[in-house]
Design a protein with these regions (language model features):
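Amphipathic, hydrophobic secondary-structure cores in small proteins
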Residues: 2-12, 17-22, 26-57
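C-terminal structural segments of small proteins and small subunits
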Residues: 54-87
Length: 87
């Protein structure tokens, strides 16, 4: 399993994502967004464990939950930005 961090425009969207991942059986934790990741938005995101990003994003799309950015969290502490959803 890989660990991804997804940022959202509002805490409500982040909370909806947390519930959707729970329903899908994926491990997920609501967290404060690190300050360097904040661009615009609420300052909250979700850390989710899933086999790949596609699996994680399918849950959000099925529930119609837009996200701002996605990141892969490496075991060594590194972070890799993967993509955007919202303009």
């Amino acid at each position: 399993m890989k660990t991804f961090f997804l940022t959202f425009r509002s805490i409500t969207q982040a909370q909806r994502a947390e519930r959707a991942y729970g329903k899908a059986g994926l491990g997920c934790v609501l967290r404060r967004t690190p300050r360097w990741m904040e661009e615009r938005g609420c300052g909250y995101g979700v850390e989710v464990k899933c086999p790949d990003l596609k699996t994680g994003l399918e849950v959000l799309r099925r529930e119609k939950i837009p996200f701002r950015k996605s990141y892969l969290l490496h075991a060594d502490g590194g972070v890799e930005e993967l993509g955007h959803d919202l303009p």
